Amino acid sequence: MVMHSEDEPYKCKFCGKAFDNLHLYLTHERTHTGEKPYECNKCGKAFSCSSSIRKHARIHTGEKPYICKQCGKAFRYSSSIRNHENTHTGEKPCECKQCGKAFSYSSYFRIHERIHTGEQVYKCKECGKTFTYPSAFHKHKSTHTSQKLYECKECGKAFDCFSSFHSHEGVHTGEKPYECRTWKSLQ
């Protein structure tokens, strides 16, 4: 049953948080129920809100609509370009209160905080193993399936890990985002 009031007509039956927008209310309640009604038709990953699946689809299409005005690098998400812009300014707005380490990216900061809390937010549904870092969790999930989720449009090679797929893309584009300082100094 949805509770209504004049100012905040939608109140969460699980935690009491109130909303004045039905869409935000329904999306919030899914954080409690775990309901994920929006499923990707490419890889089967499910989402609790429609905007998340639209953003996710860019992984499969390769679309990167956000372009950095300083260096031309393209990004899938608006949050990624905002964080990237800090690399040009050197700004590191996210500082850990526990150890003082600072980060350009808020997502890196949130992951770093888990070092101090020991929090393991990723749990494998297959075996129950828990993980602190999303990269380790996603890599682990591939041990339970032989399905390859990321396929190269150029050559057809498939990968179960996005980071491996992304690195492979450089074979076709010639992009080499990581340079060896030692090798460069020898040239």
From Swiss-Prot:
Q: Which domain of life is it from?
A: Eukaryota
GO cellular component terms listed in the entry, alphabetical order:
nucleus
In alphabetical order, the GO MF annotations are: DNA-binding transcription factor activity; zinc ion binding
Q: Which Pfam families match?
A: zf-C2H2 (PF00096)
> Where would I find the C2H2-type zinc fingers in this protein?
10-32, 38-60, 66-88, 94-116, 122-144, 150-172
Q: Which segments does the entry list as coiled coil?
A: none
Which GO biological process categories is it annotated with? regulation of gene expression
Identify the keywords attached in UniProt to this record, alphabetized: Metal-binding, Repeat, Zinc, Zinc-finger
Protein known as: Putative zinc finger protein 833
Native species of this protein? Homo sapiens (Human)
